[in-house]
């Protein structure tokens, strides 16, 4: 057994040395690979001139006042809802004439209610969202003519507009009934799931671009780490028996590979975390309580091949980013075979994935920079909205027609906010 482990370790070291040298050539020579098919063109689309967005002017209690009370919201992985609002206020797609708008946006910061430790509390979010919708339905005519079908909302919670961080309870709640006709822009994405409805736009979580930029290392640094991961394997406070968190996938990673020399995995989060990702060939991106996490963004930005362990996940901007070509997908049940899966990937396949990841448009699409830049996540969201135009005949209701049930949902959600 020891000889086998030693042989694997030697093989891994040789692979890492070779890949590191090749990656160094890629970075020094700025070698990238054109994204195949139409995806590259889609990433580089300019949404300006293809749609107009009207931004509702809501009282500050729905947005800016919440942020003023707790500025930590700007650095949270759910901060896309704040930065999207800021972006649209000065965007060329914004119109001040609602009669010419293709889309209507309601700026509600539903995740900006944090615990002392910085975790979001979603319990007030449904009442807050409902209050905002009641306001726009009362003061403007545009909601009522479509009951939200030409409106979009940014809902970056763990399980989107189901507004709960535990999947079982999120499923029990379902999507807020008043949002059933709206387009949801959300980080959560999983096929055939109650909390992802048809037509939603799946986006990356927020990861601070400036912070990542500050941790860039020289481009000629070899990738000497084969597999890298930092994070929880067990969530003992919320899942003391250990069978529910990450559907056991993270626990399986730890139990199978904690002593494997190929795997640099730990619960410790070192100050060199970003640098270590840039020294790694593969970065594990397993599900946690939800399928997604900022690791996916970080892996792409730092050119570390994302190893996605989350069955049926719907990835950000999947119609534009060729995830199958840049990442590795491992079924949750196959985690015990992770070492053999990764070591069996041909070197030329790994190098091609690295060249694709080196494409600047790939990295840009995953970020919400300040100020906004061409091709970034803001523009990918607008591109997604533009591709839904023109609206179909079923968007606008006939006089007197109603599609939504304003009294549906949990009783607690009907209380005033």
Swiss-Prot record:
Domain of life assignment: Eukaryota
Q: Which residues are glycosylated?
A: 144, 405
- What transmembrane ranges does the database entry give? 4-24
Which is a Pfam family this sequence falls into? Exostosin_GT47
Topological region Cytoplasmic: 1-3
Membrane topology is: Single-pass type II membrane protein
**Which ranges make up the Lumenal topological domains here?**
25-417
EC numbers listed for it are 2.4.-.-
**Swiss-Prot/TrEMBL GO biological process terms:** cell wall organization; glucuronoxylan biosynthetic process; plant-type secondary cell wall biogenesis; protein glycosylation
Looking up InterPro entries in the UniProt record yields: Exostosin, Exostosin_GT47
Cell compartment(s), UniProt: Golgi apparatus membrane
| MF (Gene Ontology) | glycosyltransferase activity
Its function? Answer: Involved in the synthesis of glucuronoxylan hemicellulose in secondary cell walls.
Can you say what this protein is called? Probable glucuronosyltransferase Os01g0926700
Q: What organism, scientifically named, is this protein from?
A: Oryza sativa subsp. japonica (Rice)
């Amino acid at each position: 057994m020891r000889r086998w482990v030693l042989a694997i370790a030697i093989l891994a070291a040789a692979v890492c040395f070779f890949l590191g040298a090749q990656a160094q050539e890629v970075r020094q020579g700025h070698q990238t690979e054109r994204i195949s098919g139409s995806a590259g063109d889609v990433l580089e689309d300019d949404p300006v001139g293809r749609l107009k967005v009207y931004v509702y002017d809501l009282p500050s209690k729905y947005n800016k006042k919440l942020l003023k009370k707790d500025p930590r919201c700007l650095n949270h992985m759910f901060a896309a809802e704040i930065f999207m609002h800021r972006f649209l206020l000065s965007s060329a797609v914004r119109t001040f004439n609602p009669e010419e708008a293709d889309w209507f946006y309601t700026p509600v910061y539903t995740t900006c209610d944090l615990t002392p430790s910085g975790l979001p509390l979603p319990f007030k979010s449904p009442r807050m969202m409902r209050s905002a919708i009641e306001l726009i339905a009362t003061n403007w005519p545009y909601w009522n003519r479509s009951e939200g079908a030409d409106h979009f909302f940014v809902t970056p919670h763990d399980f989107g507009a189901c507004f709960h961080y535990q999947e079982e309870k999120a499923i029990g709640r379902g999507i807020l009934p008043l949002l059933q006709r709206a387009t949801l822009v959300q980080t959560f994405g999983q096929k055939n799931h109650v909390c992802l409805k048809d037509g939603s736009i799946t986006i990356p979580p927020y990861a601070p671009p400036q912070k990542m930029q500050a941790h860039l290392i020289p481009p000629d640094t070899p990738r000497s780490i084969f597999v890298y991961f930092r994070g929880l394997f067990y969530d003992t406070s919320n899942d003391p028996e250990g069978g529910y968190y990450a559907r056991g996938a993270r626990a399986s990673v730890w139990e199978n590979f904690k002593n494997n020399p190929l795997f640099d995995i730990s619960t410790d989060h070192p100050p060199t975390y970003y640098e270590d990702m840039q020294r790694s060939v593969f970065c594990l991106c397993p599900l946690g309580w939800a399928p997604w996490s900022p690791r996916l963004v970080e892996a792409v930005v730092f050119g570390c091949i994302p190893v996605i362990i989350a069955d049926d996940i719907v990835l950000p901007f999947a119609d534009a980013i060729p995830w199958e070509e840049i990442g590795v997908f491992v079924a949750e049940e196959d985690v015990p075979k992770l070492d053999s899966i990764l070591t069996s990937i041909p070197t030329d396949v790994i190098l091609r994935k690295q060249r694709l990841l080196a494409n600047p448009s790939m990295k840009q699409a995953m970020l919400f920079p300040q100020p906004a830049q061409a091709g970034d996540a803001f523009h990918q969201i607008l591109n997604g909205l533009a591709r839904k135009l023109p609206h179909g005949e079923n968007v606008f209701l006939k006089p007197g027609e109603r599609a939504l049930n304003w009294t549906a949902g949990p009783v607690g959600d009907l209380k005033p906010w």
